[in-house]
Amino acid sequence: MPDKPTKEKLMEQLKGGIIVSCQALPGEPLYSETGGIMPLMAKAAQEAGAVGIRANSVRDIKEIQAITDLPIIGIIKKDYPPQEPFITATMIEVDQLAALNIAVIAMDCTKRDRYDGLDIASFIRQVKEKYPNQLLMADISTFDEGLVAHQAGIDFVGTTLSGYTPYSRQEAGPDMALIEALCKAGIAVIAEGKIHSPEEAKKINDLGVAGIVVGGAITRPKEIAERFIEALKS
């Protein structure tokens, strides 16, 4: 297992490349109770030249670590109803991810009510206090959320949840305006969410982001097939 990179070293590694998100949830075609599928996705991503992997769950991350030394952005998706945040939503999930020695832990940093009752700045501070050497990424949906996370000391701000909170932009395609505004504010941005084409990725890269995560457009064959099929119907 490689040593955990510093922020500077990781930014160097991610610059101008694609981080591939390799995830499948229960009910999706590529989900398997016994695992084994996501490391194959990660292997394909590595062979293609990906600079990092984003992965969900302790099991998938461990399996991916066994086949690649690429830096991993790790999350744990777990529902805490009635609250909406489910991406690394409490310290329990942070603890589980921190034990895996991954490059980055990503967590929900939206302004929505949280299961632990904390505001996001307090949660970030608690995580930083407990794991001072762990790089952290805030999954946000608006500029203000990104700013709050940045001011609380987060290392990277991801546009992951734009369009997935009721108060954020709801259009198709990546939130270019949000990505650009965060970059202009001097924040290390990892662009993520609704990036469907190499052309979009190129435009985003030109905005000066720290990294780009592409998931569904690469690793969800059902979603890819649906886009082709819909195109023929329209």
From Swiss-Prot:
Keyword set, alphabetical order: Carbohydrate metabolism, Isomerase
Residues that span the membrane, as ranges: none
GO biological process, one term: carbohydrate metabolic process
Short name of one Pfam family: NanE
InterPro entries recorded: Aldolase_TIM, NanE, RibuloseP-bd_barrel
Catalytic activity: an N-acyl-D-glucosamine 6-phosphate = an N-acyl-D-mannosamine 6-phosphate
Source species, domain of life: Bacteria
Enzyme Commission number(s) from the entry: 5.1.3.9
Pathway membership, UniProt: Amino-sugar metabolism; N-acetylneuraminate degradation; D-fructose 6-phosphate from N-acetylneuraminate: step 3/5
Molecular functions per Gene Ontology: N-acylglucosamine-6-phosphate 2-epimerase activity
Role, per record: Converts N-acetylmannosamine-6-phosphate (ManNAc-6-P) to N-acetylglucosamine-6-phosphate (GlcNAc-6-P).
Protein name: Putative N-acetylmannosamine-6-phosphate 2-epimerase
Native source organism of the sequence: Streptococcus pyogenes serotype M2 (strain MGAS10270)
Organism lineage: Bacteria, Bacillati, Bacillota, Bacilli, Lactobacillales
